[in-house]
Amino acid sequence: MSVETQKETLGFQTEVKQLLHLMIHSLYSNKEIFLRELISNASDAADKLRFEALANPELLEGGAELKIRVSFDKEANTVTLEDNGIGMSREDVVTHLGTIAKSGTADFLKNLSGDQKKDSHLIGQFGVGFYSAFIVADKVDVYSRRAGQPASEGVHWSSKGEGEFDVATIDKPERGTRIVLHLKKGEEEFADGWRLRNVIKKYSDHIALPIELPKEFHGEEADKPAEPEWETVNRASALWTRPRAEVKDEEYQEFYKHVAHDFENPLSWSHNKVEGKLEYTSLLYVPGRAPFDLYHREAPRGLKLYVQRVFIMDQADEFLPLYLRFIKGVVDSNDLSLNVSREILQKDPVIDSMKSALTKRVLDMLEKLAKNEPEQYKTFWKNFGQVLKEGPAEDFGNKEKIAGLLRFASTGDDSGEQSVALADYIGRMKEGQDKIYYLTGESYSQVKNSPHLEVFRKKGIEVLLLTDRIDEWLMSYLPEFDGKQFVDVARGDLDLGSLDSEEDKKAQEEVAKSKEGLIERLKKVLDEQVSEVRVSHRLTDSPAILAIGEQDLGLQMRQILEASGQKVPDSKPIFEINPQHPLIEKLDAEPDEDRFGELSHILFDQAALAAGDSLKDPGAYVRRLNKLLVELSA
């Protein structure tokens, strides 16, 4: 044992303490995953060493084969995991093992409910890595030295996972990391070769490095040699380099958990080898749930990049557009150079070709999922639908393909579920209908009862109901689908084309003419609040409604701009009246101009509320309404 110097005791970051406590209790039912997590980290350490050694070969310190060794001591009740990867300096150890440098950590911890099952899913998607050791160990010792540093700059980190850790400088001749788990009482099962072998085969067979265990001798061979003989217990070949026919679903699933640091199986994957002008292999996964930081646009994203099977970088985000940032996986290129950097990636035309092909592959994978496994696609849509809606604005070339993957709620049923594909909508269109009708709003309950839908209900025309905050912005980039134009039913002068008969159109014109006097009176009273007053073609039951001008911003877009601190251009709505409604007939017959003005303002405010808008002067509305109620009850 080497002499320890510069020993100090430090406290864990608050979030680490919380996470340790929650994890030990929430993940206990799946405790064997600690080995998968530690092996995954060791594999990453070897990848990083290979990459840094491209520019600095001395880091390999003699070039012994990179490997991971797992051993155990029944008497001491310990499990030891050792790698000869990049290793850690004292600073690395304090940073990586004492803090969590993830954006959104505090938000993530707030979402934990105390429900063990739910929390285990959340913690799983956060990625626990090293800390999973404390599920089975009551003390963990880490001995490490970073490649390239002298033997005298090794480091020993030790903790019982209870709020603080010790760190000291030691002599460590060999680079890399050795982790010793002092197993808790009751966890002796892991100090066993057969048990460890099974866990490694189950979770880590796909790891490209050899994972070695001491060879066990039985019967006549029971006298073990003093020095252990090591044997490799995993396949030790990069999974994506193997032919698809040879890879089992379980292997694909475990590999996903390794690259994505996820605890759950993916929804789907696509493994593909491209040969010809470009040569690369990709293995892309659609996760089963959204990560907690999906909407943090600065959160790390991207694929693991390898060049000729040599790891180059994590989170290479140049291979997929931002709206597919949830996709996980690996891309291994034969065309890029080994000294490729992020700056080179951003300028290399080869990358553009790969990005285009990989994007198409992901969209094809999603199409296949939607067609063959609609229930799975429903899960996908629930988790990632809003992110996919960013696609039409970002990826003009694939706009139609992305639009085909979108799902919406509609008046076709009362579920409020976003389950209607545009192709389904078109398949149900009425004879003579050549447009796709939609309505945006704050919530499903608000839009499903909107007066804007009255004429559509009467004629049996389906309308898509769009209530996600991004929807109005999305539709500004999606003018049509399959040659059919999108029409916002709350915008402009509604024209149903051939869905209105000639008699209907003639009747509308005559009614509008007969109400010209009323229209003029309303314009005079509401002049400051409206851009226009007209007879409505939308209404059958309500007395009045507000429509948006053809070029004006809708409520959702105004809110988005206001929230981002941008100036919102002033605009006034169009006030439409239903001439057949008894209230409008009474209003038309009202001789007292003051009373006419009060009633007109009440109708205008009610129309604003029905459209989901807020009142500019709610006090005045309440005063007018109370006055009217007093008159009626007199």
From Swiss-Prot:
**Location in the cell:** Cytoplasm
- Output a single Gene Ontology CC term carried by this record: cytosol
Q: Where is this region: B?
A: 343-559
Q: Which GO terms describe its biological process?
A: DNA damage response; protein folding; response to heat
- Mind telling me which SUPFAM superfamilies this protein's record contains? ATPase domain of HSP90 chaperone/DNA topoisomerase II/histidine kinase, HSP90 C-terminal domain, Ribosomal protein S5 domain 2-like
Q: Residues annotated as region C? A: 560-634
Q: Where is this region: A?
A: 1-342
Listed A to Z, the keywords are: ATP-binding, Chaperone, Cytoplasm, Nucleotide-binding, Stress response
Task: List the Pfam families.
Answer: HATPase_c_3, HSP90
Q: Which GO terms describe its molecular function?
A: ATP binding; ATP hydrolysis activity; ATP-dependent protein folding chaperone; unfolded protein binding
> What assembly does the database describe for this protein?
Homodimer.
Instruction: State the PANTHER family in the record.
Output: HEAT SHOCK PROTEIN 90 FAMILY MEMBER
Instruction: Name the chain's protein.
Output: Chaperone protein HtpG
Which species expresses this protein natively?
A: Pseudomonas aeruginosa (strain ATCC 15692 / DSM 22644 / CIP 104116 / JCM 14847 / LMG 12228 / 1C / PRS 101 / PAO1)
Lineage of source species = Bacteria, Pseudomonadati, Pseudomonadota, Gammaproteobacteria, Pseudomonadales
